[in-house]
Amino acid sequence: MNLVNPSILVACILSFCLGAIGCLAFSPFDIWLIAYLSAAGLIWAATLVERKTAMLATFAWSIGYFGVGVQWVNVSMTQFGGVPVIVSYLAVLLLASYLGLYNLLFSYLARRFGLISPFVLASLFTFTEYLRGVVFTGFPWLQFGYTQIDSPFAQLAPIFGVEGLTFLVILLSSYLVDIVKNPTRKIATFTKIAVIIGFSLASNLLQFVQIDQQKPPVKVALIQANIEQQLKWDPAHFENTLRTYQQLINSSLAENEVIILPESAIPALESKINPLLNQLQKMAAAKNTEIIIGTLYENEQQQLFNSALVLGNQTKPYQLHQSLRYNKHHLVPFGEYVPFGSLLDWMREVFILPVNLAKGPFIQPALFTNKGKFNMAICYEVIFGHQLQQNQLAQQADYLITITNDAWFGDSIGPWQHLQMARMRALELGKPLLRAANTGITAVVGFDGKVIKKLPQFETNTLTAEIATTKGHTLFGQFGHWLIYSLSFICVAFGLFRRQKHKKH
């Protein structure tokens, strides 16, 4: 097989397959080495000699990668949105095609400016991945860096974040492709790979944070009520949902200092369950316990928020419009709001979409408890590392916390990928993370990104743990993405300079 200048058909089939296997590098499969093979497929496709072949192969790789990796989105559409199966898979294909545009841009830039050295390719990919994470509110799902959280290179995350790990995957994969395309240089290329791996492994010698011995561990209880999505908003099932939460809370009050409930735990407007929340406030305060709960909050201007607040504080008791709360900032397009206003509002009727939610500020105060400060991310937000990093920089919180309802995605791989991204936030910022999920996966994650304890999915239960906070700051926590973006800018600038110099000669 001619891998240097293959036919369009061979290039597209091979690229599609190499893209599709990339899913195995992510949770729940966690075969992290496959990321390098899959990424090599992208680099190979994007830098093929013939422009048409390169673009079609890059697109085929993207369809395989995203089509398989995010196929779980069809679960919410078919099971809970009333969308026909064929339409749901067409939607997945459309999403994969859209995400593939960023890889096409990557291929175009690399070929247009002749920037095909490994460091420059990794830098260009950092740029196109940045665009994928911000354009139309962003969808930075399936970034290669997440696959490395259990690899020997994971400690690059506290320095450069998940983007730094993605940079490494693309860099090493580019050198692998170079070996295939230029076998006469393989000794020199293997030497470069060894040096890069050596420097990357050296990150394990750095320690940015350590357990704070001055602060006692907090006894936490994470509640997983396991309310089926079909029943969650069914009025006939409301009392049963209420009983489930009351039983789980009552059994946790005496032994724990902080109890955490999932996103929009009680399926009603906060104003409608005000008596219940006041009751929980009194019960928790009497036991010297505090409850962090997700609610659906309507403010005095009749704006609706996906919200979270603290109950049980003895000095600042719960009040509907006065209590300190966190309002979700990064909303899910077509899930919590319809983008482009009235232009796409017709989709609300076709796909049975929920009402439009308002979004909270980008930077918000931490949720305060007597046992520490909590940096909150609700559901989808936890995939946006920049948001948590900026809030952590402003808040100096003791713990990260994320509450979610992944029941929308059933027993697909989606919730596992979601947990993997939450783990990366803990590793990047060097803070323990607490994750309460309606149907799972509820988990306690250490500051090193390792799962300390977790509950099985679809089990009604409470996860308890004693978790200590840390002292110190990671470089990523201090500088965010600027370190990897600066490195990428320097690499691209140097690549352009060398190309210009080459032209003159």
UniProtKB/Swiss-Prot annotation:
Membrane topology (UniProt): Multi-pass membrane protein
Presence of the UniProt keyword Hydrolase in the record: no
Transmembrane regions listed in the UniProt entry: 6-26, 29-49, 53-73, 80-100, 119-139, 152-172, 189-209, 475-495
Protein keywords: Acyltransferase, Cell inner membrane, Cell membrane, Membrane, Transferase, Transmembrane, Transmembrane helix
Nucleotide-binding in keyword set: no
Pathway the protein acts in: Protein modification; lipoprotein biosynthesis (N-acyl transfer)
Protein family (similarity comment): Belongs to the CN hydrolase family. Apolipoprotein N-acyltransferase subfamily.
Protein name: Apolipoprotein N-acyltransferase
Organism of this sequence: Haemophilus ducreyi (strain 35000HP / ATCC 700724)
